[in-house]
């Protein structure tokens, strides 16, 4: 059914012409389509910036509607072993390419999760089948790709998408799906997802279940407290009102079902932002301590005890606090 389709897939660009961002990359890829020739490619950049989309659009433009016959997509996170290289990749690389385009394409998504041995095997396979196959490797961290592969590929760096591009795309999707929205809700999605288009579209789809996309519904679907509530808790602690701050903490833990890790990450963001006025020397102390608390929580320490201790530390520094917005 239509409503069950993931919007991130439904609105994924089908051709290079439909990709509105990463313009320099798109222009370079279009030249490959025009010439019907290309080197092995390495797409590097954060999640949700269009690496897989660009690869799929490229092969669609190269082969047309029958692109699946000449294209193999593997996720290296699911299949990290050397057998993937020796079996699936080699089997596909041996088969005949299209008459129109003299090579087939293999996309290895999340290639930075491949083992070093698998990458070495891939390097040898790339050399062996260069005449009939082109490889596109997509990774989040370029440093995790071995140098012999980097030297055999053309590098394309993908950057987080601009706010204007993401917001406009989300508004277009909301209108197309006939979902009411508050512009601040759309902007909040960008502020949280930070240029990750796939995550942003997933959030807007989840928030649409509430009937209207607002700041409140966005934070609800993400399981996060609104920044103003985190600031209220910090303000109480920094004003010396430890017990009230602890009550607010318990409210966040119980009412929102937040984990201690979720809360301390939001606390860190508020401490390093501009909404709370804290002297720089105090800010350094608190951010450092927030890091310690997050480490202990991740190691299995009790969420409430660790966060209460953090609030107590804030309360002890109350005389240095000059208030906040």
Curated annotation (Swiss-Prot):
GO terms for molecular function: ATP binding; ATP hydrolysis activity; DNA binding; DNA clamp loader activity. GO terms for cellular component: DNA replication factor C complex. Keywords: ATP-binding, DNA replication, Nucleotide-binding. CDD domains: AAA, HLD_clamp_RFC. ATP binds at residues 45-52. It comes from the Archaea. Coiled coil: none annotated. Part of the RFC clamp loader complex which loads the PCNA sliding clamp onto DNA. Heteromultimer composed of small subunits (RfcS) and large subunits (RfcL). Belongs to the activator 1 small subunits family. RfcS subfamily. PANTHER family: REPLICATION FACTOR C / DNA POLYMERASE III GAMMA-TAU SUBUNIT, REPLICATION FACTOR C SUBUNIT 4. This is Replication factor C small subunit. It comes from Sulfolobus acidocaldarius (strain ATCC 33909 / DSM 639 / JCM 8929 / NBRC 15157 / NCIMB 11770).
């Amino acid at each position: 059914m239509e409503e069950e389709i993931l919007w991130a897939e439904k609105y994924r660009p089908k051709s290079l012409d439909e990709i509105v961002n990463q313009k320099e990359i798109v222009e370079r890829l279009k030249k490959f389509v025009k010439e019907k020739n290309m080197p092995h490619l390495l797409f590097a950049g954060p999640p949700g910036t269009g690496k897989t989309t660009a690869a799929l659009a490229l092969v669609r433009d190269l082969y047309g509607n029958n692109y699946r016959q000449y294209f193999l997509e593997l996720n290296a996170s699911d299949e990290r072993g050397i057998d993937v290289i020796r079996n699936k990749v080699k089997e596909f690389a041996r088969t005949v390419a299209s008459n129109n385009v003299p090579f087939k394409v293999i996309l290895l998504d999340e290639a930075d999760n491949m083992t070093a041995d698998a990458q070495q095997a891939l390097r040898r396979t790339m050399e062996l089948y260069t005449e009939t196959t082109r490889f596109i490797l997509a990774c989040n961290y370029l440093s995790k790709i071995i140098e012999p592969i980097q030297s055999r590929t053309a590098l394309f760096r993908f950057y987080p998408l601009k706010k204007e591009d993401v917001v406009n795309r989300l508004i277009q999707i909301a209108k197309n799906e006939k979902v009411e929205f508050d512009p601040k809700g759309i902007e909040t999605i960008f502020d949280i997802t930070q240029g990750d288009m796939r995550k942003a579209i997933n959030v807007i789809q989840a928030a649409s279940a509430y009937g209207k996309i607002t700041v409140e519904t966005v934070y609800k679907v993400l399981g996060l407290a609104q920044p103003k509530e985190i600031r209220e808790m910090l303000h109480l602690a920094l004003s010396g009102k430890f017990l009230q701050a602890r009550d607010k903490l318990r409210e966040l833990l119980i009412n929102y079902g937040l984990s201690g890790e979720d809360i301390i990450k939001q606390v860190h963001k508020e401490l390093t932002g501009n909404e709370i006025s804290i002297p720089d020397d105090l800010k350094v102390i608190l951010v450092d301590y927030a890091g310690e608390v997050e480490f202990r929580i991740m190691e299995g320490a009790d969420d409430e005890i660790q966060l209460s201790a953090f609030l107590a530390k804030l309360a002890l520094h109350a005389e240095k606090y000059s208030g906040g917005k």
